Every structure is written in structure tokens, then in C-alpha cells.
Amino acid sequence: MRIKMFAKIAVFTLVISAVFSYCKNNQGVSGVTGWKYNDPAGTDFVVKQGLITQIPMGMVAIEGGSFTMGEKAEFVTQPRDNRQRRITVSSFYMDQYEISNVDWREYSNWMKVVFGKSAPDLVKRSVPNVNTWREQLAYNEPYLQNYFSHPSFNQYPIVGVTWEQAVDYCAWRTDRVNELALIKAGVIKAPNFASLDSMPYDSIRLKFIFSTQKYLLQNSYLPEPGRNARKKGAQLSPKVDMSDGIMYSDYRLPTEAEWEFAAYAITSDKNDIVAEGKIYPWAGQQTRLTDRRNMGRIQANYVRGRGDMGTSGIANDRATITGPVNSYMPNDFGLYNMSGNVNEWVLDVYRPSSFDDVAEYNSFRGNVYVKNKVDSKDSFGREVFEIDSLGRIAFETTEDLRNFKDPDPQAKIPLDTMDISDVLRPVIDERSRIFKGGSWKDRVYWLNPSTRRYLDQGMSANDIGFRCAMSMIGDIPQTKRRR
């Protein structure tokens, strides 16, 4: 009996070894046609093998799942615009910290270097509105003069930026990250910024500026090839595409569902039991730490009460206005300041009834479907796309779904009409964007990640910032999988 058992084990081992050997020897061969991958003598169909998923710099990988989105506490003077709803979000990445002043100054500096001489009006689009610090009955001029520009505030969150500016920043970040990835891979050469002094504006936007979509879709756009540029016959072509695994997906603002899911950081215990119903991004019903070492310390930057900042040396939240983006303890996903410090823009259009209307999976209101603008066709019949003022492919709207299934009559009020029902709030329309999280000037109620407010996408405030997100391509990088 024992000999038979050993024989079976030996046969099984040989079969497994043969399977692994076959797979190893046929990694470069199509499993459906038998033709070789990555064969220059053939069609040169490139298949990236052994790709290890890289987490984008400064981001945290968040595994998606289902959770109960919506109100966790009731406030009688606030409208019930966040009724509970069970939804599911897919896996994504999110910035560990809020975008800081130094992050934004990098963006502003790039815009100034590239467009400062040829198109100075474009540079103004990257400048935050420092006037948001002004209040009629407060002396905030030092913040107006220094908050954005002084190195002492480098790691403080950027404020005074509109939703539109935040979206532009995400697009700029996508292009800069992908440009650097191609440079490091030796596919293209680094841009020569010194050449901008004598370069006309059209050459800058058409040829000098790297844009991810322009690189992928515009056949006439050919950056200078790098040391590892791919050869095709006698021609040196630096072009790669997303299948090469070098470039990243688009940076963007998180959807409201993603932001709330990330803020609560709902995880299971060792028995795979998930406890929902958290009020804040941390455990418990209080805003103070309860562990012995940090007992009594406040866990977020907010206003506890009028005239209740604390006294010199023992300020209750250790911040007068905003605080550094790495202040306080992170939540269970490793994200900092998901409550307090500054409110954060999300991608969604605001509607009081959104929770009743949106889809169960990847809930979102605000879809605007677009297509690239075609300028002409080249001699091969390929489409030549129009390039916009920032050097990106221009697009046109094909379908606007921001008001899709919208029962709210306020959404149909003209922009120049005042909402007489509540003069303290802006009119609700397709430009109303949600911000969440609470800030340095908010009371504790707004620290609940389920609370939501809105502002016109072209307006800014000294307590609203943002962080970026990115859809995850493939599986989440995991060191430990569930049983």
C-alpha cells in the first residue's frame, strides 16, 4: 500500500513538473494560434510578460468592496441628502496626503516656464486665489501674502483652487508622470526647456509639450527618440502604447463613493467579520485618542467650539489654520486627514437625491461623454486631431448626463436666478460640485465622511483642497491573500 502511494505521488509530481515546464517554454507563444510574441521577424506583436504592478508615487492601493454609503448621524437643521445605500466600488489608488502647496507650486512653475513668454494668460489658470483668505472682519493679510509662497507652508494643503483647477492639475500630473516614465525607460529623451526662449507658441503646444493622449493617438507627434527606442525596419520609432506597461492610467479626482469608502477604511478582522457604522475615519465615537500613550489628543484639525482653540503651548488640535498634510494619525488604509484640515473636492455633481438614483456599482453622477475633435486626415487617411491651447488633444461633448434622471427642479433654474428658498446656498445646477471631509474652520459634525456640501465648480475657498485618485488596472498588489 505504501509503495502504491509513493508511486502515485511520483507520477503526480512528474505531471506537475511537465505542465510548469511547458508553460515556461511557451510564455512567448500565443496559446490560441501558436505564433510567437515579440518576434521582429514576424508581426512584432509585443506582449509584456512578468509585469509587476507598481503603485503610483505618493499613492495608496485601496482594495474595493461593498459598504453602506450615507448618513451615520442625523442633524436636524441639515437636509437629508445622504440617505443610506448599499454600494460597491472597484479597487483604486488614492493619494496618501492632500495636495500640498509645494506640489501646486511645481505645477505653477512648469506652466510659467513653458507658457510664461508665449501665452502668459494660460499661466494665470494655475495660480490659486489667495484672496480667499480675506474676511471683512479678520486680519488675514499675512496668510494672503505667505501661505502659498513661503517655504514654511510647503507641506500645508493647497487651498483657494477651484474644482476646474483641480481637474486641470490631475491632467497635468498624468502627462508629467507618463513623460518621466518614458524618459526613464529610454523611450524618449528629456525635453530641452532652454529651447523655449526662441520657440513660437504653436510649436510649443504642438511639438514640445508631452501629452499622454497626443502621444498615443496623434501619429504626427514624435518626441525625440531615447536610447531604448524601438526599431521598426530602418526607421527608429519611439512610440510605445499602454500594452507595454510603462505608462500609468489617468490621475483624476475621486468619485464621492470612492472618497467615502477610502475615508471610512472599512476592513475585516481576523475572522473576516466587518463592522460598519463608524462615525469617523478612526474607531470610536470620540474625536480624541484613547490609547494610553496619546490619551486625550485630538485626532483631526477642526473647530471644537467658538473661542476654544486652547491656550499657548497646549492648543487642542495643534493648528491655528490648516496643518501639515502629514499631521495626525492615518486611517486604516494609511490615508491622512480624511477628516479635518481641509475639505476635499470630489468628482461628482451634487444632487440631494443622488443616493436614490445612482448605480449600485461604482456610483457616480456627472458623466459627460466626449470624443476627440478631428481636424483633418493625413496622406494615409489617418485622423489628425485638433490640439488645444495646453498642447492636449481637444474634445467635444457627445452626451451630457449630469442632469440624467434628475427630479430636482432647482437644477433647471437659470444661472442668473437666485434661489430664494435659501440665500445662503448657491443654486443647484450642473456646475454644483461636492466637497467632503470637514476643515480647520468646521465643527465636528462635518468630520463625518458621509456629510456632503457643494459649491460652483468655478469657485474656491480657503478651506477646500483636494487629493488625486487613479483607477486600478489589474489586481491589487497583495502580500497576503485571503484564505
Model-derived features with residue positions:
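Mature N-terminal segment immediately following signal peptide/propeptide cleavage
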Residues: Q54-E71
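Extracytoplasmic
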Residues: M57, G64, Q84, V89-S91, ...
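Active-site microenvironments of metalloenzymes and redox enzymes
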Residues: K24, F92-R292, G296-R297, L347-S353, ...
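A short, compositionally biased domain-edge/stem linker segment
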Residues: P40-I55, K232-D241
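Short loop/turn microsegments at loop-to-beta-strand junctions
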Residues: M57, S249-D250, M329-F333
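C-terminal, low-complexity/hydrophilic appendages and adjacent surface loops
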Residues: T77-N82
